[in-house]
Regions:
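Long, charged/polar, low-complexity intrinsically disordered N-terminal extensions
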Residues: 1-122, 142-176, 180-181, 185-188, ...
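Structural motif
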Residues: 37-42, 67, 127-130, 423-424, ...
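Activation corresponds to long, low-complexity, non-globular regions
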Residues: 204-219, 224-313, 317-328
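C-terminal effector modules of nucleic-acid-centric enzymes and ribosome-associated factors
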Residues: 437-440, 445-448, 453-555
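Beta-strand-rich binding/interaction modules
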Residues: 428-438
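Accessory interdomain/linker segments of ATP-dependent helicases and helicase-like nucleic-acid enzymes
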Residues: 7, 284-429
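Flexible loop/turn segments at secondary-structure boundaries
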Residues: 42-47, 131-136, 405-410, 427-428, ...
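Metal-dependent DNA phosphodiester-chemistry modules and their immediately adjacent helices/loops
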Residues: 115-256, 263
Length: 555
């Protein structure tokens, strides 16, 4: 854990209130997010029990599966969920704007700019916690290969028409959520924990009620007591006053309330199926409806507090100004959303169960690159985050004491000004290290010089630097040679070189991330990674033939 995060948590314990971990909002927050609060049944992974979903905080849509073991009722739930989610997504898919992007020319292989469509905005799905993201990913994996009655008329348990499409979108959102900095699918606990430091552990921060209790405790109470109350307080019936944010439910709720209600619903359904006449059928239908209504009330009692907590978290986040680089990351999300929309429109098959070697390598490289970019951009956007990097020796703020103009020894000399700077930080800046500062939205690099290099060209300046003239107690002098972003002429452009007295923050990490090496086509990978496809008629090798059964295989 970074030192500044540890200090913030200690301060939260001392004051009884969460401390800011950021001064700006580091994630995009849609003006109209779709909030999803799901519940699942204990004992079976991904078996839905119900959900609250919608974009209106005052009018959520309640979806319930009265008997989670009934496959038809599950499909009905998924179809209703699709009827809410897909129209929301299609609203954004229909609004496009022209945009330029760089692509490889198929004939020449050169990178050229082309004009294409980009969705003007993208949807945003907000769930209470990380377990909600995993459930979205699980629902996508379980449903994107479903066959509808139209596709497979004779197949058992055909899925409603929109369920496979919902699965494909959920799969895309779940995969995109693994990309650092993405905001298409976000967990409220992660958003709040990124912007506030509480007096509890990171694992305890996954409890939405406790996290909000630290950030915004009730009047006259402190975060520790309020969080403990949110985690443990129960009513006279033994039910938690602050239900879990889901998708898992509290065992006391399952055993005392849910299981008896489901049993009453099953009994009412069986009795209705055995009805002998119309009068008894009407009476039993009313009993079945009442049992279902009871189940709906139970599910709403567990999901509505979480629904309100998610919107309360959204209100807290909206009080923060948006970071400068958030729009850039959201544009990447828009490109991702547009690309998946185009794949669906082109009739491409669902995402495969397992990625091939090249696709997997590309995804890993993308996540590593985006993580480095996110770390750099958050520090550039937020002085509080940059302070943490300075404490870690990865950046330093320095005052320019002197500027000496030097030039390269080439036929066409270029400016290479040498700066003498004074800092109170302790950066890990050995001679030869590159450092960077932001200039007009782009990075300008410089190189840390050793005093000996300066002494060769200017003995007097080298002696002053070696003696530490100009540095007070706890201060350090550094020599920086500016390397780029000064124009093409002999004299640097105005404003491209720091002036004496300027105070500048330099970083030891790069601001932009370069792309990795070009990966081979899947057909050209070695046999250890899938390899070329076998030629037609090729005999299977011994590695693909089943082992013969021997007596040792039988007990």
């Amino acid at each position: 854990m970074p030192l500044i995060s540890t200090l913030a948590r200690l301060e939260a314990v001392r004051t009884g209130r969460a401390q800011p971990a950021a001064t700006v909002l580091h994630r995009h927050l849609s003006a109209r997010p779709l909030v999803l609060v799901p519940l699942t049944t204990a004992g079976e992974a991904g078996a839905p029990l119900g959900a609250l979903v919608g974009t209106d905080r005052d009018a959520p849509r309640l979806l319930v599966v009265p008997q989670p073991a009934d496959r038809e009722l599950r499909f009905t739930f998924l179809a209703r969920l699709a009827s809410v989610v897909l129209p929301y997504i299609e609203e954004y898919a229909a609004q496009v704007e022209p945009a330029e992007r760089t692509e490889a020319d198929p004939e020449t292989g050169k990178r050229v700019k082309v004009v294409t469509e980009l969705c003007a905005d993208a949807p945003q799905l907000v769930v209470p916690g990380r377990a909600g993201i995993e459930l979205v990913r699980l629902l996508g994996r379980a449903n994107r290969f479903r066959r509808t009655a139209e596709e497979e008329p004779e197949g058992p348990y055909p899925a409603p028409e929109q369920v496979p499409l919902l699965g494909r979108w959920f799969t895309h959102l779940g995969e995109r959520a693994r990309v650092p900095g993405s905001s298409l699918l976000v967990a409220m606990t992660d958003l709040l924990a990124r912007h506030w430091a509480t007096g509890q552990s990171a694992l305890e921060d996954q409890h939405l009620g406790a996290l909000l209790a630290w950030i915004d405790p009730p009047a006259g109470d402190d975060g520790d007591r309020a969080a403990r109350h949110a985690e443990l307080a129960r009513d006279e019936e033994g039910q938690l006053l602050c239900p879990p944010a889901g998708p898992a439910t509290d065992p006391a709720f399952d055993n005392k309330l849910l299981a008896p209600a489901v049993e009453r619903y099953d009994q009412a359904r069986r009795a209705l199926a055995d009805a002998q006449d119309g009068e008894s059928a009407d009476r039993l239908l009313a009993a079945t409806t009442a049992a279902e209504r009871e189940l709906r009330a139970l599910v709403e009692s567990r999901t509505r507090p979480t629904w309100d907590a998610v919107w309360r978290g959204i209100d807290l986040l909206r009080e923060l100004p948006e970071g400068a680089h958030v729009t850039d990351r959201w544009t990447r999300d828009r490109w991702s959303f547009t690309a998946h929309r185009d794949r669906l429109a082109a009739g491409e098959p669902p995402q495969p169960r397992r990625d091939d070697a090249v696709t997997a390598a590309q995804k890993l490289a993308t996540r590593e690159r985006e993580q480095a970019r996110l770390d750099a951009q958050e520090a550039l956007d937020d002085p509080l985050v940059m302070a943490g990097r300075r404490l870690a020796g990865e950046a330093f703020a320095a005052e320019v004491l002197d500027v000496r103009m030097t030039y390269t020894e080439s036929k066409r000399p270029s400016p290479r000004p040498v700066l003498t700077v004074r800092t109170e930080d302790a950066p890990h800046a050995a001679p030869g290290t590159k450092v960077y500062r932001e200039l007009d939205g782009r990075p300008q690099s410089a190189e840390v010089l050793a005093p000996e290099e300066v002494a060769e060209a200017d003995p007097e300046a080298g002696a002053e630097l070696a003696a530490g003239d100009g540095a007070g107690p706890g201060e350090r002098l550094l020599l920086l040679r500016v390397l780029d972003r000064m124009g093409r002429g002999r004299e640097p452009e105005e404003g491209s070189v720091p002036e004496k007295g300027d105070r500048i923050c330099w970083t030891l990490f790069e601001h932009d991330q370069r792309g990795g090496p070009k990966l081979p086509d899947p057909e050209e990978t070695p046999w250890t990674h899938g390899g070329p496809p076998e030629p037609p008629g090729a005999l299977p090798g011994p590695a693909t033939a089943p082992d013969p059964v021997t007596p040792e295989d039988l007990l």
